[in-house]
C-alpha cells in the first residue's frame, strides 16, 4: 500500500511539474504587447527641401546666440511635415543624438499607459486619471512616479540584492520593450523624474553614476508625436484624450511665463501674432536642458511636428522659438 501511495505521489508531482513547465512555455511564447491590428510605423521620406529649411532654421538660432557661445553640439531638431498624411516628409539636425529628455519622456509614458488601458493590462481609476492629467498638463514629477509604478508593477524603496534587483529591473524595463517592439531605437524610457535626486533602488537602477538615465532622440520623439496626431498609437477616443492633454493655450494669459504654452514653441506663435494657430506639446526643462516637442496647425494649412532639444542653455527661452519661427515663415513655400 505504501508503495502505491508513493508511486501516486511521484506521478502527481511529475504532472504538476509538467503542467507548470508547459504553462511557462506558453506564456513566454505569447507576445508581450498587443499593438493595434492595423498598426504600422509612420512612413517618413527624407526631403531635401525640408532639410534645407531646417538647417537654415537651426543656423539662424546659432547665429542669433553666437555671442553666448551657442554651438551646433547644443541643438538637435527634427521636423515632420504632416500636410499630406499619406506622404510624410521629414528632416533632422543631429536627430539621432541621445539626449537627456527631462519631462518630454512623460509623453512616452502617456502613450504606454493608454495602450495598457486599451489592452486591459491595468484598470482606470480616478487616481490614475488625476495622475495622467497632472503628468502631462502640469508636468508633475510626483504624478509621473506614480504612473511609472502603474505601468511597470514596480515601486521605489531600498536597494535590493542582485537577484531581486534583476527581477525588479526586468519589470521596470517593460516600457522600453514596448517601444522596441515598435522599432524604436536609441532611446531609454525607464526612469522616474525627480525634482531633486533619486535614492535607494531608483539610484541603484540609474547606475549610481547616471549611465542608465532616460535618453531620447529628437527623431524618436518626433515620430511618436506624429503617430499620436495621426491616430496610429491607439483608438480615436484615446487619441483625442491624449491630444486634449497636450493642447496648449499660448494665446491665453498665464501667471507662469515658462509654462508649456508660453515658455517654449508657443513664444514663436505669440511673437508672430498667430492667435488663430493651434499648439499641442510636451516640454522638458532642467538646469541643463530646455526641450519642446510640438505639433502646430496654422490657419493657412500648415501642419507639422517640430521637436527641438537644447543643452547647456536651459534658461535661454528664445532658442526654440527662433527655430520655430523660421519653420513657420518658410514651410508654406515648400509644395
Report the location of each language-model feature.
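Short, well-structured active-site flanking segments
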Residues: 115-133, 144, 235-239
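Acidic/histidine-rich, surface-exposed loop or edge segments in extracytoplasmic proteins
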Residues: 31-44, 88-94, 112-115, 152-159, ...
Amino acid at each position: 500500500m505504501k508503495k502505491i501511495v508513493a508511486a501516486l505521489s511521484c506521478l502527481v508531482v511529475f504532472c504538476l511539474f509538467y503542467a507548470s513547465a508547459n504553462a511557462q512555455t506558453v506564456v513566454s511564447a505569447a507576445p508581450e504587447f498587443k499593438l493595434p491590428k492595423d498598426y504600422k510605423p509612420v512612413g517618413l521620406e527624407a526631403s531635401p527641401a525640408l532639410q534645407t529649411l531646417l538647417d537654415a532654421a537651426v543656423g539662424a538660432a546659432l547665429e542669433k546666440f553666437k555671442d553666448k557661445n551657442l554651438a551646433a553640439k547644443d541643438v538637435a531638431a527634427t521636423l515632420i511635415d504632416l500636410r499630406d498624411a499619406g506622404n510624410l516628409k521629414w528632416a533632422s539636425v543631429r536627430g539621432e543624438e541621445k539626449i537627456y529628455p527631462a519631462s518630454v519622456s512623460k509623453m512616452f509614458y502617456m502613450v504606454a499607459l493608454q495602450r495598457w488601458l486599451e489592452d486591459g493590462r491595468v484598470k482606470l481609476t480616478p487616481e490614475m486619471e488625476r495622475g495622467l492629467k497632472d503628468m502631462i498638463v502640469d508636468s508633475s514629477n510626483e504624478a509621473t512616479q506614480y504612473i511609472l509604478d502603474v505601468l511597470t508593477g514596480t515601486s521605489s524603496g531600498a536597494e535590493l540584492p542582485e537577484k531581486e534587483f534583476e527581477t525588479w529591473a526586468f519589470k521596470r524595463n517593460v516600457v522600453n520593450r514596448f517601444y522596441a517592439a515598435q522599432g524604436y531605437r536609441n532611446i531609454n524610457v525607464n526612469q522616474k523624474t525627480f525634482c531633486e535626486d533619486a535614492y535607494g533602488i531608483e539610484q541603484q537602477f540609474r547606475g549610481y553614476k547616471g549611465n542608465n538615465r532616460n535618453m531620447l532622440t529628437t527623431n524618436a520623439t518626433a515620430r511618436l508625436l506624429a503617430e499620436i496626431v495621426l491616430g496610429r498609437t491607439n483608438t480615436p477616443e484615446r487619441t483625442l484624450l491624449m491630444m486634449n492633454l497636450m493642447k496648449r493655450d499660448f494665446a491665453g494669459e498665464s501667471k507662469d511665463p515658462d509654462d508649456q504654452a508660453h515658455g517654449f514653441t508657443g513664444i514663436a506663435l505669440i511673437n508672430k501674432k498667430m492667435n488663430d494657430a493651434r499648439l499641442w506639446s510636451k516640454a522638458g526643462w532642467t538646469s541643463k536642458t530646455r526641450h519642446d516637442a510640438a505639433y502646430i496647425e496654422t490657419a493657412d494649412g500648415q501642419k507639422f511636428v517640430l521637436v527641438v532639444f537644447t543643452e547647456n542653455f536651459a534658461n535661454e527661452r528664445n532658442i526654440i522659438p527662433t527655430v520655430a519661427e523660421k519653420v513657420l515663415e518658410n514651410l508654406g513655400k515648400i509644395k
